[in-house]
Amino acid sequence: YYRELTEKKSDMFVLGADIRHYQKIHRDLIWANRFAASTSFGPSRLIYYMGGVDNWMRLPFGNVPQFDQTVPVNPNVNYGFQALATNMRGFTQNIRNGSNFALINSEIRWPVVRYFAGHPLRSNLLNSIQLVGFYDVGMAWSGWDPWGNENYWNDKVYRNGPVVVTIDAMREPLVMGFGGGARAQLFGYFIRADLAWGIDNGYILPKIFYLSFSLDF
């Protein structure tokens, strides 16, 4: 719950959940799963931008923008704050947006060096090296209905002088991503490198490379 002291109609309510389960497959081979969801309501709301990963590092040779400016936001909602809904690999930030989101992340984690050694190693680097395969699925939306008219990410707006044309893009609220990557602890930082493909409306999108620093999940 949040409220500005100087504003009467600034109440914001946020409810969310983050549930994780780690299943041992064989020795150090792990199947990790996460379900996260959140909703905000009240006169003022929190907008969630879905897409990308936490602490995504912008690379000088990358030509993919981190935030998709072409996906519109509902101008009729009073958004007081913003947050990222991650992980949704295969996309830039803002592939979907709204005051609600839900997503599932599923990963197979293989600490390859430690697995074949059969015991923990003295080297933090060798001990932490992992290969991963992952699949993400999720959606972000406004209102009660993910397919409702409150979702402006479903609109495409064309402007030609004084003429403005809005077309229903027929986008499905659900997006998915899959791929693989590597993890390692280097100089005290846990580094993640992922290569992912997004699936939007049944189409597989061009791959996106992510370099990030995060221990979460």
What are these model-derived regions, one by one?
Residues D136:
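Short basic (Lys/Arg) and small-residue
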Residues W144-G180:
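A short alpha/beta connector and helix-capping loop motif
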Residues A184-L186, P206-F217:
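Outer-membrane beta-barrel "beta-signal"
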